[in-house]
A protein has these predicted regions:
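C-terminal helix-coil-helix/basic helical segment that borders enzyme active sites and/or dimer interfaces
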Residues: 27-30, 260-293, 303-315
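Glycine-rich beta->alpha junctions and the first turn(s) of the following alpha-helix
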Residues: 174-259
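Generic structural signal for well-ordered, non-transmembrane alpha-helical segments
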Residues: 220, 252-259, 288, 292-299, ...
Length: 354
């Protein structure tokens, strides 16, 4: 299942012929599924030439993310934060760093990471940061930390190979994204370079753009599931078992769903590159719409494919089972009704397009 179509690029806004350049990358990703060091090397190679959002090729960036995730959801989960870290640094005017990078911006109860001034006027990080994916295998990360007093949080560039960095043992029992454990990291006076001042990390347009890039990854994983379903129907038809009306209706539903989600991403990419924020809608509201639209599409596709294919491939097909489990965890980065409530609150205050 999926052997003939899973490395096809995902089309968002390019012409199909333009996507052919992605094929060697997708083949390399497929050859190294489950091999995290190799996938990090691939991410580093991609990062040298990948476009930044907001510079005229946002749609191509999202096609890259979606296409890699369609081959392997975990590979997309590795690639996206590396590219996001490079984009964050570039947006602040910093040079592109060497090595594999991540972004650690989560907060957790009972865990606090503080940035303190050192004797030379720079910063050192002290404390703990939760949800640090692959920290032990990365070279560096963009990390948010609390500034002294009531200044809020700022983003810092940090060398994760510093001896003051201690990666905790992840209590990772997940069946999805098993090769990408997230766990706590302890920082003991680790030197850190401030990227920009307090509030910049969350207030910059790139924060919303990055959130939509994650949605492109989700959609890529769901499109791979849809391709699995379509292939299964085609194989059955070749054996004389034509799809019934329910299966065809569900495939049609999936087709419409993918088209709508793709159109939402394409429209957002076009706006980002044209620097045309709507007069009545903030950048973050736009991101909430896109992420919500794509997350709903992903969950719809997951439900329809699972109902039609039944338990067989979940139990006996490694690639399909892995994709399903990986995507189910990844899409939970969307906060469902809480994100919709945030969007609704903004809409009520006039931050809407209708």
């Amino acid at each position: 299942m999926g052997e003939t179509t899973e490395f096809q690029p995902v089309l968002i806004s390019s012409e199909p012929v333009q996507l052919q350049a992605l094929q060697p990358t997708l083949d390399a990703v497929h050859a190294h599924i489950g091999d995290v060091p190799a996938l990090l090397d691939i991410a580093k190679d991609i990062g040298r030439t990948a476009p930044h959002p907001g510079e005229g090729s946002t749609g191509k960036l999202w096609e890259l993310l979606a296409s890699v995730t369609a081959v392997d959801v975990a590979a997309g989960r590795i690639l996206e934060p590396h590219l996001d870290a490079l984009h964050i640094l570039a947006q602040a005017g910093h040079d592109q760093p060497a090595g594999a990078w991540g972004v650690f911006a989560a907060e957790g109860p009972g865990q606090k990471l503080e940035a303190k001034k050192d004797d030379d006027g720079g910063y050192v990080l002290e404390g703990d940061k939760p949800w640090c994916s692959l920290a032990a295998q990365l070279d560096g990360a963009v990390i948010t930390a609390h500034l002294p007093g009531e200044e809020g949080r700022a983003a810092f560039a940090v060398d994760l190979k510093d001896p003051g960095v201690t990666c905790g043992e992840p209590a990772w029992t997940s069946r999805g994204l098993r090769e990408i454990p997230s766990g706590p990291v302890h920082f003991n006076r680790v030197p850190a370079t401030i990227i920009e001042g307090p509030g910049w990390y969350h207030q910059r347009p790139g924060f919303a753009w990055g959130g939509m890039g994650v949605a492109a990854c989700w959609l890529g994983g769901a499109i791979a599931l849809a391709r699995d379903f379509a292939e299964s129907l085609a194989r059955s038809a070749d054996k004389g078992r034509a799809a019934d009306q329910i299966a065809l209706a569900h495939l049609g539903d999936i087709d419409r769903t993918i088209n709508s989600a793709t159109a939402s991403l394409a429209r957002a990419a076009e706006r980002i590159d044209a620097f045309e924020p709507d007069a009545f809608s903030s950048t973050w509201s736009g991101a909430l719409r896109v992420r919500g639209t794509v997350a709903a599409a992903v969950e719809r596709i997951q439900t329809l494919v699972s109902q039609n294919l039944g338990p067989g491939p979940l139990a006996f097909n490694e690639a399909y089972g892995k994709r399903t489990a990986d995507l189910s965890l990844y899409v939970r980065q969307h906060h469902a009704m809480r994100d919709d409530a945030q969007l609704g609150s903004r809409a009520l205050q006039g931050d809407r397009e209708w």
